[in-house]
């Protein structure tokens, strides 16, 4: 119990250090900070140039957050892969408590009970407008073409499912305290490749990815990623691959990241115009630098780390776009921006040898591992009106603790 209390105090060091509890926790909702959570996907601690003096990446905008805010040097995600980490962030609980575990890729059933408190419902009750934009990967209830048949067919061919994309998709963010949602069901290498806005698939005209993209390129080398096993999938080069499967006809793999960032910015601008006195919380869940490493053409070829490094630059640019929008709307002073990653980078020893870059800052393990490199993540928080000087917190904490921290503020 004593150890738990010590950990609890460490979790709230930001609140205690930055401002008097008696003056802030009693504020009216109109004076509470806006909150933007930017969650990178598979970005290692060592990918942030401000955290790794040997980094071959360049992240000037994330580095600026370090220079202006709180840098947690011993932060950990709730898991070493996507779903457990996101479950912990959204619910404030560790993933082993979830009744249901992994299912099939983007067709995962909802993992979070509708009656459970989440960061969305918590902040809703505190008077916030809440939004979830980007990668979800916590399960959804899909409508079926034939209710008496399983959604995923038996056998090896799981490309064509029993999913009716014209029907409402429930059990997601809107059922869990988010007023607005614009999501990708799972990772950008997992079908179905569709955008869902407030429970409706944007484009229900479904094709297969292999109908729109060549499985290989003329330049593709016959040396596949170690985890790549299915010759039916799309594979262009190291890190640029995704599973074949159902996809909206209008969906563009190479434009997904930009669409998510644009939707997040649009939510902020629309909210401030519509309800300037109401605080908002945006959970902006990016798809990069998770595979496929498909950076915008503006960034292609600009990094010494190949496609992966190009994608890191685009992630950093997304941070810049968010902060620029907050400044343009004159709300940056009272907006808390949280930047983190859902787990360590998937960066094998071969990659380290080829690029001379340690995504996970030399720590043992990588994404998917129980070792430190699998879950030791960057965590940086800025809040200009309250955090006047940058400082570093060396105490151990977890992204799971963010929900409790927000609860303490409301």
What does each model-found stretch correspond to?
Residues 5-10, 35:
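Terminal low-complexity, poorly structured segments
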Residues 1-5, 27:
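Positively charged n-region of N-terminal signal peptides that target proteins for export
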Residues 23-410:
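Formylglycine-dependent sulfatase
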Residues 8-21:
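Bacterial N-terminal signal peptides
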């Amino acid at each position: 119990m004593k150890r738990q209390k010590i950990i609890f105090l460490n979790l709230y060091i930001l609140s205690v250090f930055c401002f008097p509890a008696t003056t802030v926790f009693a504020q009216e909702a109109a004076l509470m900070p806006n909150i933007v959570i930017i969650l990178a996907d598979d970005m290692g601690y060592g990918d942030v140039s401000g955290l790794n003096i040997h980094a071959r990446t360049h992240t000037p905008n994330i580095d600026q957050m370090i220079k202006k805010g709180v840098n947690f040097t011993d932060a950990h995600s709730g898991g070493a892969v996507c779903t457990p980490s996101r479950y912990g962030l959204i619910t404030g609980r560790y993933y082993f408590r979830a009744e249901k575990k992994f299912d099939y890729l983007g067709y995962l059933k909802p993992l979070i009970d509708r009656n459970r408190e989440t960061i969305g419902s918590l902040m809703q009750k505190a008077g916030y407008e809440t939004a979830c934009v980007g990668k979800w990967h916590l399960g959804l209830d899909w409508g079926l073409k034939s209710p008496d048949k399983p959604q995923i067919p038996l056998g090896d061919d799981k490309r064509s499912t029993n999913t009716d994309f014209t029907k409402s998709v429930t059990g997601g963010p809107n059922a869990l305290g988010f007023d607005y949602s614009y999501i990708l069901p799972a990772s950008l290498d997992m079908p179905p490749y569709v955008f869902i806005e407030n429970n409706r698939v944007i484009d229900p005209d479904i094709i297969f990815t292999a109908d729109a993209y060549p499985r290989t390129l003329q330049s593709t080398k016959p040396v596949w990623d170690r985890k790549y096993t299915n010759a039916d999938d799309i594979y262009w080069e190291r890190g640029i691959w995704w599973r074949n499967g159902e996809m909206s006809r209008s969906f563009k793999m190479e434009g997904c990241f930009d669409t998510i960032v644009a939707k997040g910015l649009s939510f902020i601008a629309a909210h401030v115009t519509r309800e300037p006195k109401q605080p908002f919380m945006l959970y902006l869940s990016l798809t990069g630098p998770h595979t496929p490493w498909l950076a915008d053409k503006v960034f292609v070829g600009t990094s010494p780390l190949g496609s992966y490094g190009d994608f890191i630059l685009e992630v950093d640019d997304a941070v810049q776009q968010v902060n620029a929008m907050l400044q343009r709307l004159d709300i940056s002073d009272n907006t808390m921006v949280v930047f983190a990653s859902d787990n360590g980078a998937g960066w094998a020893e071969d990659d380290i040898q080829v690029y001379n870059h340690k995504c996970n800052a030399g720590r043992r393990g990588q994404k998917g591992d129980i070792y430190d490199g699998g879950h030791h993540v960057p965590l940086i928080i800025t809040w200009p009106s309250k955090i006047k000087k940058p400082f570093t917190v060396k105490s151990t904490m977890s992204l799971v603790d963010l929900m409790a921290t927000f609860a303490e503020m409301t």
